[in-house]
Structure formats: C-alpha cells, structure tokens
C-alpha cells in the first residue's frame, strides 16, 4: 500500500523518498487490544481484551485460536459477573472482559491469567483463571481484588477479610475519592521476582497504580501480608502505591526486569483519536 501527501500551498519539488512512504500490509493481521504476550516452547501467545487470542512462531505470522473463555465466557465468569460488576448501565459480560495478563506459576505448575471484569462506576474485579496449556481451556479460580465498593455492598467482596472491623464500622470514604483510592480494578500486571515472590500491580487513572503480594500457592492475594494506611503511599486493601493518582491519566502498568533494575511502563492520555495516547 502506498500513501501520498499533498498541500494547496506552492511547493518545490521534493525527492521521491520524501513524498512516498511504503506501508506493506502485515501478513496475517490480527487486531488485539491490550495485548499480553508470553512464550512457551518456541511459540508466542497473545491474549487481549474481549477474549481475543492468537499465536505465532515468528512474531510476524499470526493465527487466532479458541478456548472455553472465547467460546463461552459465561461458563467461567457468569457467577462473578452476576455477583459484582453487572448493573443496568453495564448489562453484558461479553464486552467487559479486559486486559488479561498471563504468567507461569512455578509452585502451582499452572499458567495463571489475571483478567479484569469491568463494571459501571469502577465496580470491577480482577479474577484468576488457570490452565495447563496456553492454547487449552481455562479454569476459574476466584477474585483477586475488587473496586467500586461502599458501605452498602462491601460485604459482597473480600474487603472485610482484609480490613476486618474497618470494613463494617470504619470510614470507607477514601475508596470513593478520585483523589485518594477510588481506582478501577483493571489492567492487572503480575510479576515474579528473582527470589520467587509474586506481586501484582493494577489500577487506572484517578487513584493511581497500586500493587500487593500474591500467594504463590494459590495465585490469589496473600492475605497474610498487611499494609499500613499511609496517605498517597499505602493502603490496607490496595497495598503499595506505585505511581499516578491525583485525577490524572495513567493505566496499563507493566514491569520489565533488566540488569538488577525494575522498569515500569504506563499508558498516558486516553484512547480517542485526539487523546494523545502514549507509553512512558
């Protein structure tokens, strides 16, 4: 495919390579939003929003594949969808499975998928699914972290287990403040440290990016770890604040470990045509 540029203003002749840009069509083009890529035995697998999956052996030629999550998401997620994110403003599960990330768990000997199930007004939940093969079927394990809760519905989450009496009798107003910890439980990014610890970052916009420790035996939250309440730094439920907040953009956190350093990548702006979407 060839693209050309033109102008109504008088111009001088430009070299051909300045006026024509070649854009060869990508072979096997497959559109996947919020992609997470993982390699196993020489094959690369991509998982994305709305349960899109593809694989490749050369990172150029891709083919889609199906599993029970793509074919029948309600069979895996119907229970948690009805219990938390589903609302009149947001009635369909199919369009609300967002931004999965997949990691191998050495202790469980399973592939672990952390998937966001999105709801209206931040009433979302990140759940864990496991599989023996990346191109196989998935098993639902349970919720990892909730958002969008208040005093009226907090009993339907694991917040009371984490906060204890505070969830029933304490002040939960910080979880309703866009300048504090009113985050959206989406965009999970699990990481494995060199010494075997598992952590997961998550969050989006407004309240910033947070992370807490996972239990490698279950793949879920490590309930034995407690976090203090320190404004702008730590929260008993959401763990440790990593970045962002103050009603600013910032989502899709991702970590890369190189030469003893951890590097955090985040998306800024918004995804509209004029949103200035960028990764820093």
What annotation goes with each model-predicted range?
Residues 1-280:
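Carbohydrate-active catalytic/glycan-binding domains of CAZyme proteins
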């Amino acid at each position: 495919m060839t693209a050309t540029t033109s102008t109504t203003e008088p111009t001088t002749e430009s070299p051909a390579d300045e006026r024509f840009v070649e854009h060869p069509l990508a072979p096997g083009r497959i559109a996947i939003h919020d992609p997470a890529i993982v390699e196993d035995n020489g094959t690369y697998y991509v998982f994305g929003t709305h349960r899109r999956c593809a694989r490749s052996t050369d990172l150029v030629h891709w083919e889609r594949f199906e599993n029970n999550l793509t074919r029948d998401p309600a069979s895996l997620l119907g229970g948690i969808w009805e219990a938390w994110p589903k609302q009149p403003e947001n009635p369909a599960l199919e369009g609300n499975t967002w931004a999965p990330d997949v990691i191998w768990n050495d202790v469980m000997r399973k592939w672990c998928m952390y998937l966001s199930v999105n709801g209206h007004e931040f009433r979302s939940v990140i759940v864990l699914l496991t599989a023996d093969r990346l191109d196989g079927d998935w098993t639902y394990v349970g919720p990892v972290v909730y958002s969008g809760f208040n005093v009226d519905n907090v009993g339907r989450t694991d917040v009371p287990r984490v906060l204890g009496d505070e969830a029933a009798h304490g002040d939960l107003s910080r979880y309703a403040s866009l300048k504090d910890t009113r985050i959206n439980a989406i965009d999970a990014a699990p990481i494995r440290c060199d010494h075997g610890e598992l952590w997961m970052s998550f969050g989006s916009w407004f309240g910033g990016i947070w992370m807490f420790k996972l239990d490698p035996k279950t793949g879920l939250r490590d309930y034995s770890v407690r976090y203090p309440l320190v404004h702008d730094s730590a929260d008993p439920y959401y763990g440790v604040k990593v970045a962002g907040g103050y009603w600013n953009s910032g989502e899709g956190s991702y970590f890369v470990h190189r030469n003893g350093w951890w590097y955090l990548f985040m998306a800024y702006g918004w995804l509209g045509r004029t949103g200035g979407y960028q990764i820093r």
